Each structure stands twice: as structure tokens, then as C-alpha cells.
């Protein structure tokens, strides 16, 4: 990722998030975020595939914790409050995927010890597929919603909108495309509500998992 992007765009986005009254996550919070995400992934097809078809709470938690640690310097990671009822992770334009060595040195070895070496292969297979689609639709010139997770007991209380709207307004102001993918059909309608269009729907090759690639064009009327 371009160092200039990290130096300028990421701090600018964080200022917008703070101005909206949201909480910029600190490194000390990453374990709690991983717990929130792992709980939300109990019925998520992709994570079940990562762990050979059966939900594994510890594996999901480790995947998220290692991923968040790896991208801390590059990402905009924020929550609704310090209570962390929900959080979002955005990566700026130029992101092409997590690097293997930082992933391993930030806790990936613990994931291997827990789940076996095969899980790294499945993670790489998915990320390669997902990043190729992102490049196809945005040429990597996008703000990428890597994760949006809400505690189950906090769902339906407007937290998703609280997290999404300031960043989407920022994308509109900057005339930037927003990109995301989901592997659960029920989520497609949620993201359409925020202005995302479904660009591709297909089964990931050699897996039972569906993939939904979505793009949101900047809305000039919001500027």
C-alpha cells in the first residue's frame, strides 16, 4: 500500500469518524473485536468452510485477531463506543490483501497450531479470489469495507447505520468508490440499503461458499 495513502487518507478518515462521535479502536481492543466478530460468524458460510464445514469459535476468533493485528497500521478500525457493541474495518485504496509473513508473525502460527496448516491454504485461496474480484470491479481504487460486525444482542438497534453512514459520507466527499463482499445472501439487501449494487454472485470455485461482490459509487447529491 502506498505510504502516502497511509499517511494522508487514513488519518483524514479517522478524523471524520471521530467527528461523528465514534470510537477509534486501540490495539488493546483488538481481542474484544475478534470476540464480537467470531460470535457473529457462528452461521457464516465462509468461516465454516475455513474450518472444514463446522463452526470453530476459537479458529474464527484467531483469524480475526491476527487479521486485525496485521492491518492495524493501514486500516480505519472503529466502534460505536468503547463498549464495542459493533465495529467496522475499512482499508484505503491500494489494498491488495494481507501479506503472509506479517500474518504469521502477528499470531498466524497459533492459528496453524490450533487448526492445522491447511487453514492457511484455505485463507490464501479465498483472499486471492476475493482480491482478484475487487481489482476487476474497482482496479483497487476504492475504500474497502473489510468487516462490519455487530453483537447479536445489539443487532436491530441502528448500530450498523451509525457505523456505516459517516464513512460513506466521507467516500462521497472524496468521490471514492466503496467496495465490499459478503458470503451470505441475507446481507445483500442490507448493503443495498446503503447504496451498494450487486456486481457479481457466484460460487467460489472448489468450495460450497457463495460470494457476493458489491460496489457503491459516490453519490454527488450527498456532497
Locate predicted features:
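Active-site rim helix/loop that mediates acceptor-substrate recognition in acyltransferases
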Residues: 54-76
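Conserved acetyl-CoA-binding loop-helix of GNAT-fold acetyltransferases
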Residues: 147-150, 156-169
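C-terminal "cap" of GNAT-fold acetyltransferases
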Residues: 176, 180-185, 204-223
Amino acid at each position: 500500500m502506498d505510504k502516502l495513502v497511509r499517511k494522508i487518507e487514513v488519518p483524514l478518515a479517522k478524523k471524520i469518524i471521530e467527528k461523528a462521535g465514534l470510537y477509534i479502536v486501540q490495539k488493546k481492543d483488538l481481542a474484544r473485536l475478534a470476540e464480537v466478530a467470531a460470535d457473529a460468524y457462528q452461521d457464516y458460510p465462509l468461516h465454516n468452510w475455513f474450518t472444514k464445514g463446522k463452526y470453530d469459535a476459537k479458529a474464527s476468533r484467531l483469524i480475526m485477531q491476527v487479521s486485525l493485528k496485521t492491518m492495524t497500521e493501514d486500516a480505519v478500525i472503529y466502534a460505536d463506543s468503547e463498549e464495542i457493541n459493533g465495529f467496522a474495518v475499512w482499508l484505503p485504496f491500494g489494498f491488495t490483501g494481507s501479506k503472509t509473513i506479517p500474518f504469521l508473525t502477528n499470531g498466524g502460527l497459533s492459528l496453524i497450531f490450533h487448526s492445522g496448516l491447511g487453514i492457511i491454504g484455505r485463507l490464501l485461496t479465498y483472499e486471492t479470489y476475493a482480491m482478484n474480484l475487487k481489482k476487476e470491479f474497482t482496479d483497487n481504487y476504492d475504500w474497502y469495507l473489510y468487516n462490519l460486525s455487530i453483537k447479536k444482542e445489539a443487532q436491530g438497534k441502528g448500530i450498523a447505520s451509525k457505523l456505516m453512514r459517516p464513512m460513506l459520507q466521507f467516500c462521497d466527499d472524496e468521490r471514492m468508490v466503496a467496495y465490499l463482499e459478503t458470503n451470505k445472501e441475507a446481507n445483500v439487501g442490507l448493503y443495498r440499503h446503503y447504496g451498494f449494487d450487486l456486481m457479481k454472485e457466484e460460487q467460489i470455485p472448489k468450495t460450497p461458499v457463495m460470494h457476493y461482490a458489491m460496489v457503491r459509487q459516490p453519490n454527488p447529491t450527498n456532497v
